C-alpha cells in the first residue's frame, strides 16, 4: 500500500486569490487569513496575485480565466453571501458553488472554495477569524496541500 500526503511548502509557488468586494467586512478578514497562512508557509508576497471582483457571483468567471491561462499554481476563492442581505440568496449560492466546482474539476490548477454562505453577518464574521476560525486560512493550507498532491501525481 502506498499512501500520499500533501505538504504545506509554498516556496516557488504562484497563487491567485479572488475576493468579492460585497460584504468586504468579512472578505477582507478572509483575505488576511489566507495571505498570512500562505506567507507562513513560504509563499512570497510577490507570488500572490489578488483579484477583487464586485460580488461572489463574479468569482467563477475570473477563476475560469485565471485557470485557463495556467500561469498560477492554484486559486483561492473568497466571498461572503449572507441570507439577510441578499434577496436572491439561493440563486447566488447555487450559481457560485456550481461555477467554482466546475472550474475545480475542469481547470488546469487546484481551486479552493472559500465562499461563506451564512444565515447572518454574525455567522460570517465567526468564520472569518472569529470563534469558528478563518476559512481563508483553511483554504490556503488546503490549496498548498492540493498543489503538492497533484504535483506528486503528475510526477508518477
Swiss-Prot record:
The keyword Transferase applies. SUPFAM superfamilies: Lumazine synthase. The active site is at residue 88. GO terms for cellular component: cytosol; riboflavin synthase complex. The keyword Transferase applies. Pathway: Cofactor biosynthesis; riboflavin biosynthesis; riboflavin from 2-hydroxy-3-oxobutyl phosphate and 5-amino-6-(D-ribitylamino)uracil: step 1/2. Pfam families: DMRL_synthase. GO terms for molecular function: 6,7-dimethyl-8-ribityllumazine synthase activity. It is an enzyme of class 2 (transferase). (2S)-2-hydroxy-3-oxobutyl phosphate binds at residues 85-86, 127. One of its GO terms (biological process) is riboflavin biosynthetic process. Keywords: Riboflavin biosynthesis, Transferase. 5-amino-6-(D-ribitylamino)uracil binds at residues 22, 56-58, 80-82, 113. Its EC number is 2.5.1.78. It catalyses: (2S)-2-hydroxy-3-oxobutyl phosphate + 5-amino-6-(D-ribitylamino)uracil = 6,7-dimethyl-8-(1-D-ribityl)lumazine + phosphate + 2 H2O + H(+). It comes from the Bacteria. Belongs to the DMRL synthase family. PANTHER family: 6,7-DIMETHYL-8-RIBITYLLUMAZINE SYNTHASE, 6,7-DIMETHYL-8-RIBITYLLUMAZINE SYNTHASE DMRL SYNTHASE LUMAZINE SYNTHASE. Catalyzes the formation of 6,7-dimethyl-8-ribityllumazine by condensation of 5-amino-6-(D-ribitylamino)uracil with 3,4-dihydroxy-2-butanone 4-phosphate. This is the penultimate step in the biosynthesis of riboflavin. This is 6,7-dimethyl-8-ribityllumazine synthase. It comes from Pediococcus pentosaceus (strain ATCC 25745 / CCUG 21536 / LMG 10740 / 183-1w). The gene is ribH.
Amino acid at each position: 500500500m502506498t499512501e500520499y500526503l500533501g505538504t504545506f511548502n509554498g516556496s516557488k509557488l504562484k497563487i491567485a486569490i479572488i475576493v468579492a468586494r460585497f460584504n468586504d467586512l468579512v472578505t477582507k478578514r478572509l483575505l488576511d487569513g489566507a495571505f498570512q497562512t500562505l506567507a507562513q508557509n513560504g509563499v512570497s508576497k510577490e507570488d500572490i496575485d489578488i483579484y477583487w471582483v464586485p460580488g461572489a457571483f463574479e468569482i467563477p468567471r475570473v477563476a475560469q480565466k485565471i485557470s485557463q491561462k495556467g500561469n498560477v499554481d492554484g486559486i483561492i476563492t473568497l466571498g461572503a453571501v449572507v441570507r439577510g442581505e441578499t434577496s436572491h440568496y439561493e440563486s447566488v449560492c447555487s450559481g457560485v458553488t456550481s461555477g467554482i466546482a466546475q472550474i475545480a474539476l475542469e481547470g488546469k490548477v487546484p481551486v479552493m472554495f472559500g465562499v461563506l454562505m451564512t444565515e447572518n453577518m454574525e455567522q460570517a464574521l465567526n468564520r472569518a477569524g472569529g470563534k469558528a476560525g478563518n476559512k481563508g486560512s483553511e483554504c490556503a493550507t488546503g490549496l498548498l496541500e492540493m498543489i503538492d498532491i497533484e504535483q506528486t501525481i503528475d510526477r508518477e
